[in-house]
Amino acid sequence: MTKAELKELIDSWENLQYLVNEIVRNPDYYKLLIELAFYDTHPKSWRAAYLVDKINDKHPELLHPFLSAMINQVQIEKSPGKKRHFLKLISLNDLTEEQQGFLFNFCIETLKSGKEPAAVRVHAMQILQNIAVKEPELIPEILLIIEDEMENHLTAGINSRGKKLVAKLKKALDKI
């Protein structure tokens, strides 16, 4: 499959399950999918990010070689849909200290941003909680940020995820 063929197939929702199966059977196609998700400006290139997300559900090992590139891409990504998928995928993976350092600042800015949709901010909040689990000294700061967002920029998604994450962080703080 070529990138042009992938673009054509991705245009139709009816082809998405076929593409998932085809890419899982032929992991070389995964790189094409990643390139389309990261670098293409095609209006429906967010579907490539959606496919990466769906494939990750059953084959997370395919994403590992591209995780650092995804972390770099998320900081310049303009599409909220693609950014949401990228942050969700990042939140599901173990991160190096260097990746955590970058993402800590990025996710705080993203969470506090009134310009980002709630779905993007929720995944940024999840990444912050994941980092706090590995770096317990950050728990008080992250708790304050999440609670502030819940108080001042409340949406259903922020409230729902925020309550769960605050409870987990407070429980972790009690163990320190």
PLM features per residue range, with description:
Residues M1-I176:
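Alpha-helical scaffold domains
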